[in-house]
Amino acid sequence: MFELSDNLEINTEIFQGSKIFTIDNFYENPDEISDYLFKEPAPLHKEYDNPTYNNVLFEDRRLRTYDVRLQPVINFLSKLSSQKPLLYDITTNQTRFNDDEFNDYKNCIWWPHVDEGYNGIVYFNKNDTECGTNLYSEITDVSEMNDYDNIPEHFAPWRQKEKYQKIKTLIPEYNRLVLFDGYKFPHGMNIINDRYFSDEYRNNQVFFFERA
């Protein structure tokens, strides 16, 4: 199921002293995997958080399930990132938005955050080369830092653009993997148009690793 393409070409970029890896045509059979992962909507992410606008003004869904067939992929990315896997589960993101002024992507960015270590993302939307992943400078605004500590993610996920400095955008492409240091770089999905203000979900598969 999760066979990698033969003769993978790994592009390595050094950005601010950190390696960012990009691999196009990552999976041998991406359509089969996409059908397997995204045939049905995944459960709501953080569905028990309160207060929340998830499934009210937008849908943020995540599949978490174990599949032993994914282990060789995780081991490959672990070796590439030189970090241990944080988990071995299949993990996905599925996101779409209501047409509501709350979802103000023109003036706001979606929930910049950091993770435990390297992140891998495989993009699964065809003909989308815009809504990828943004990397930001370190978050230093005190009010923003307090919000992250005290406000549930899905209650105020949109943050004012002027409070963040975007330093790089990782460009999406169907069946492209990007692997970057999600602890070093605050990051979040790059919503810059209304493509996913519809029945279509923004779909990707994610991998998490942890620094030593």
Regions found by a protein language model. Give the residues of each.
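Intrinsically disordered, low-complexity regions
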Residues: 1, 5-7, 120, 164
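Catalytic core of non-heme Fe(II) oxygenases with the double-stranded beta-helix
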Residues: 98-212
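Non-heme Fe(II)/2-oxoglutarate
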Residues: 2-110
